[in-house]
Amino acid sequence: MEAKLSSIQIPVDQDELSGTLLTPTGIPAVLFVHGWGGSQHHSLVRAREAVGLGCICMTFDLRGHEGYASMRQIVTRAQNLDDIKAAYDQLAGLPYVDPQSIAVVGLSYGGYLSALLTRERPVEWLALRSPALYKDEHWDHPKMSLNADPELMDYRQRVLTPDDNIALAACADYKGDVLLVEAQHDAIVPHPVLRNYANAFVNARSLSARVIAGADHALSVKEHQQEYTRTLIDWLTEMVVGRRIALAKEVVAARKHRLKQQSDALSSPGQGTNEFRGDIRAVENSSS
């Protein structure tokens, strides 16, 4: 993400007014990844809100869902991760998107895959709601077979480290900002899973954790859905808009400093100038 400050001249009558143009360059983007059995329709409410922040948003359907529901019994985690990479690449390739300012929002199975995505694509901000965990083995087996594992729920009650799971290992390597959202009464992705994720983000720039009181995995109650939307949008506002404001402050401060230098460089008192000419850029260092 970048902010640019430029001096401009505004013609009026026979004169030219001195002005300053302050602009962001490159638009941040948000990729939404739905959960198992879901669809992009579940993401559109949050995407609509994120667009209000000035973000480009993309939702899509994983194979095994909607138009590719015929693949439901055979689609694998590897294929769905490829789906996410393809969607990410299309979003990042848009000419007006800043490829260093992309957020990924993943739900449940989509959250698990989104964590894995961070090892293969630059993700500046990562929001995970009730991210699932699966055993590493049988990566290329149909995803449906994973849910049939009688030990899966026991696995999700265990204390696991990045050495035990590839998704947690990806989290340990991640250096961006993280939002973790837990449903208090989630019987599918219980609290130990969220604890394992939180403990894995040892190198994250920031980690925000929220619990939606009384909520189940599906956020069946409308008020819980609304609370999640507010939580996500508030966090995105802090990350994206806050970053833009910080960069704008930086270029304005740089302009002030440069004007002071110009004034100090003049030997005759009172001969300084408050007119600035040129461009100043402030670039945010990305996590990648």
Regions of interest found by a model, annotated:
Residues 36-49, 62, 192-193:
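The serine-hydrolase catalytic nucleophile loop
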Residues 37, 65-95:
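Catalytic nucleophile-loop/oxyanion-hole region of alpha/beta-hydrolase
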Residues 215-226:
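Catalytic histidine-centered segment of alpha/beta-hydrolase-like enzymes
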Residues 116-160:
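Hydrolase active-site cap/lid region
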Residues 49-69:
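Conserved alpha/beta-hydrolase
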Residues 174, 180-182, 186:
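Short beta-strand/loop motif that positions the catalytic acidic residue
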Residues 176, 190-200:
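Short alpha-helix in the alpha/beta-hydrolase fold that links the catalytic acid
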